């Protein structure tokens, strides 16, 4: 189109040749936080993602590299999956700094006979967001309080913990 080429997912993935269950990915793809972000909406029970997910991750995709580790299917731990990666942290927008965000998820998923499956996971996000002003807000008790950071252009810590079950 007149604005150039656009894409949703563009990455290279290298799978391990032995188990074909672990891989290294680099490019633009879904972040490994929670259950909903990693899956297409066609695979979810509702047509839209939860509002809280859309708030924290307005564009589900980000530029980064991720390692996925899984054991062989014959292992007693084959139901576990670890995804961990470094991401630009600004979705699919232009990169503005050299800081990277760490996102990881340890998940478990197992079939229940032929009719269903269960899953659970723990996610962690650690990164920074640029603050172009001298002001910031921090939580004190059950409300936000304005705080003077002293200088313009500081980076604020961005840290999320997540639990999911399905």
Protein language model regions, located:
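Outer membrane beta-barrel
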Residues: 1-92, 96-103, 107-114, 119-124
């Amino acid at each position: 189109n007149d604005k150039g080429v656009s894409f949703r997912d563009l990455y290279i993935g290298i799978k391990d040749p032995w188990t074909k269950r672990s891989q290294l990915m680099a490019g633009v793809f879904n972040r490994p936080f929670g259950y909903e972000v990693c899956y297409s909406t066609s695979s979810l029970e509702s047509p839209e993602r939860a509002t809280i997910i859309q708030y924290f991750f307005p564009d589900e995709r980000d530029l980064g590299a991720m390692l996925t580790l899984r054991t062989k299917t014959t292992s007693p731990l084959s139901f576990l999956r670890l995804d961990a990666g470094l991401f630009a942290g600004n979705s699919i927008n232009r990169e503005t700094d050299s800081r990277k965000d760490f996102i990881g998820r340890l998940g478990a998923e197992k079939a229940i006979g032929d009719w269903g499956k269960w899953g659970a996971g723990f996610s962690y996000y650690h990164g920074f967001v640029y603050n172009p002003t001298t002001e910031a807000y921090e939580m004190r008790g059950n409300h936000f309080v304005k705080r003077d950071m002293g200088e313009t252009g500081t980076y604020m810590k961005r840290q999320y913990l997540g639990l999911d079950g399905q």
